Amino acid sequence: MGYCSGRCTLIFICGMQLVCVLERQIFDFLGYQWAPILANFVHIIIVILGLFGTIQYRPRYITGYAVWLVLWVTWNVFVICFYLEAGDLSKETDLILTFNISMHRSWWMENGPGCTVTSVTPAPDWAPEDHRYITVSGCLLEYQYIEVAHSSLQIVLALAGFIYACYVVKCITEEEDSFDFIGGFDSYGYQGPQKTSHLQLQPMYMSK
């Protein structure tokens, strides 16, 4: 009963991860955040494989899913540090999340709750011609805190998924070992008793 509830919980966690990361992927696309887009895409694939492994009782898939969650937590911790400008990181000057190919920022920077965007003219000389120079004011919640909230939610789901993935793998392995112990995985097939036929040889006489 406990194994069934743990497996169902892991399926629910995988479903929640897919919903949350798809929502995050949409806004990362809108903000041209290429590094998060790539990480989200890999995460979606791994979560689907983990979900498949949970449904089909495939411990290898679940183990791979658990290993990826460790990397996923590490990535989200980095994103939190980036937006909170921990150490030498700067969300204003570093273009790590766009692979240094554009000056785009998080979509929430201009579209956060209560934000008012004002175009600045004339633009500074250093501003690229194909970019707007704007100021954002009046936000009820700054965009970096929205991004931190997204990453924090992903970390919570990943930790829960890791715990239940380890539990489900343990239960599946123990179940396979017990089944093997009683002879469930014998390589030879069962052969029923064979009937032996007794033939009586009698001499035959041919008339001339």
Curated annotation (Swiss-Prot):
Site (Breakpoint for interstitial deletion to form SUSP1-NKAIN2): K91, E92
BP GO annotations: regulation of sodium ion transport
Record-annotated membrane-spanning stretches: 1-23, 35-55, 62-82, 153-173
Keyword field: Cell membrane, Chromosomal rearrangement, Membrane, Transmembrane, Transmembrane helix
Signal peptide limits: none
Protein's cellular compartments: Cell membrane
Pfam families linked to this entry: NKAIN
GO cellular component: a single term: plasma membrane
Tissue and organ expression note: Expressed in fetal brain. Weakly expressed in adult brain and thymus. Not expressed in any other normal tissue examined.
Topological relation to the membrane, as annotated: Multi-pass membrane protein
Family that this chain belongs to: Belongs to the NKAIN family.
Subunit structure: Interacts with ATP1B1.
Annotated disease: A chromosomal aberration involving NKAIN2 is a cause of lymphoma. Deletion del(6)(q13q21) within NKAIN2 and involving SUSP1 generates the SUSP1-NKAIN2 product.
Name of the molecule in the record: Sodium/potassium-transporting ATPase subunit beta-1-interacting protein 2
Species annotation: Homo sapiens (Human)
